[in-house]
Amino acid sequence: MRTSQYLLATQKETPADAVVISHQLMLRAGMIRKLASGLYTWLPMGLRVMRKVEAVVREEMNAAGALEVLMPSIQPAELWQESGRWEQYGPELLRLKDRHQRDFCVGPTHEEVITDLARNELSSYKQLPLNLYQIQTKFRDEIRPRFGLMRGREFIMKDAYSFHADQASLQETYDRMHQAYSNVFTRLGLDFRPVQADTGSIGGSYSHEFHVLAESGEDDVIFSDSSDYAANIEKAEAIPRETVRPAPTEELRLVDTPNAKTIAQLVENHGLPIEKTVKTLIVRGAEEGKLIALIVRGDHELNEIKATKLEQVADPLVMATEAELRDAIGAGAGSLGPLNLPLEIIIDRSVALMSDFGIGANIDDKHYFGVNWERDLPVPQVADLRNVVEGDPSPDGQGTLVIKRGIEVGHIFQLGTKYSEALKCQVLGENGKPVVLSMGCYGIGVSRVVAAAIEQSYDDKGIIWNDALAPFQIALVPLRYETEVVREATDKLYAELTAAGFEVLLDDRDKKTSPGIKFADMELIGIPHRIVVSDRGLAEGNLEYKHRTEQDAQALPLNEVLTFLQARVRR
């Protein structure tokens, strides 16, 4: 491809509303253009990259035995009402009416549509297992679209759905898809981690997320430094570093604390180590009108997902209001504690191993110090309530936990029978009786993968693509292309490289565009391999080669360029 025949839309300036580096560089490199909040047009340069992601995804899905389909973006409300998600999904679901006033939505996901297809097409266990996938535009009406493609409203997604007569078959396909996902991200040259995850609003019983590691990631990715254990922050089990509760060394005492409404103030004004404090959080219970006390250490954070898994706690998690606290306890949020608390209490594992600690006295502006379990109050129910922190023991008993930031690019679920039961999707089993199908679902954010790859690989000059993702593998930059000797050598090399199967961008802009601008544009776009053709080099029988990640260029004999690139470029 020649730049004279291409839409080369690079920009020098970074748009003011672009915050994360992938958004900035995709705009500056001419990959995308903003149409409206959370909506982007893909330009030729960006689309070449996304098509490469799609191609790898397709190859791995096909290899895993999945069959490609294409479902409508617009879905009838009846299916969502049948599954119960029409009311549950909330404002992210873009709803609309047709001219006949019938309700529809723009699909954020396709569980209902695919289950409807399966119940109409499948009748016997002999047709199973069946795994169908599509690569299609999705829409979620995010309240605050931000970070470019990282959290837009419209995006390209690969979503697959599998149907099974039993759990064993589902597990087999799930494992195969897990491996296929690992193959995809490995082939794309990404540093990623698959992690155990919560199933969230999709539902089901078992899931894994796939995260590309990047400092700009929105999610915490947890993994062991000595094993293959990995989970997201919602799912990671928090194991206390302590194994035995120390014996008491202090007497229980009531202390005036008028200037200690927060943990930080308690530590600063009263000299209590933060690990000797607790947070008493009052939440609404699953039973109407009941409040539950959840207690974590002062330097730990409550994990809301873990909390809502407790049968006593309402889902979603709702904190008690100040009025509810006053009515039930007689004190405000900054003075609460488990001693003489007239509520059901659940404490975190780390709290159960504390001694000589401080708690609110359930009296405004007063705390108890020197509190000890069993001596001053009984040990209540103990549960895993907190987020893990770096350095915690790994739950598998091997090593300690490391926390890095990650960008979620894939998620796979074992849905079980959640949707098939709701939509009555069943077949006749081997015994001739109806069997409700078990389902799996498997998503990859295709457009997000492009942005995540940039977040993982860039410098102050621009994007650094690997060979698998680069829009072009080779930038061919002639200096003084208008001269006959340079033009002939360049055109001949361009033809040879193209015939050899390389993806080449020939920068044939005229002499008004300086060599410095050409080099800067190719580095901004991130093309991995650059060949410079100059009259001086040709006079010596050489061309100049430079890799995007290297500081210095090297001279290459003209007759060795093709062999060199065939060995260097990964295809």
Curated annotation (Swiss-Prot):
One of its GO terms (biological process) is prolyl-tRNA aminoacylation. Keywords: Aminoacyl-tRNA synthetase, ATP-binding, Cytoplasm, Ligase, Nucleotide-binding, Protein biosynthesis. It comes from the Bacteria. It is found in: Cytoplasm. GO terms for cellular component: cytosol. GO terms for molecular function: aminoacyl-tRNA deacylase activity; ATP binding; proline-tRNA ligase activity. It is an enzyme of class 6 (ligase). Pfam families: HGTP_anticodon, tRNA-synt_2b, tRNA_edit. CDD domains: ProRS-INS, ProRS_anticodon_short, ProRS_core_prok. Its EC number is 6.1.1.15. It catalyses: tRNA(Pro) + L-proline + ATP = L-prolyl-tRNA(Pro) + AMP + diphosphate. Catalyzes the attachment of proline to tRNA(Pro) in a two-step reaction: proline is first activated by ATP to form Pro-AMP and then transferred to the acceptor end of tRNA(Pro). As ProRS can inadvertently accommodate and process non-cognate amino acids such as alanine and cysteine, to avoid such errors it has two additional distinct editing activities against alanine. One activity is designated as 'pretransfer' editing and involves the tRNA(Pro)-independent hydrolysis of activated Ala-AMP. Homodimer. Consists of three domains: the N-terminal catalytic domain, the editing domain and the C-terminal anticodon-binding domain. Belongs to the class-II aminoacyl-tRNA synthetase family. ProS type 1 subfamily. This is Proline--tRNA ligase. It comes from Pseudomonas putida (strain ATCC 700007 / DSM 6899 / JCM 31910 / BCRC 17059 / LMG 24140 / F1). The lineage of its organism: Bacteria, Pseudomonadati, Pseudomonadota, Gammaproteobacteria, Pseudomonadales.
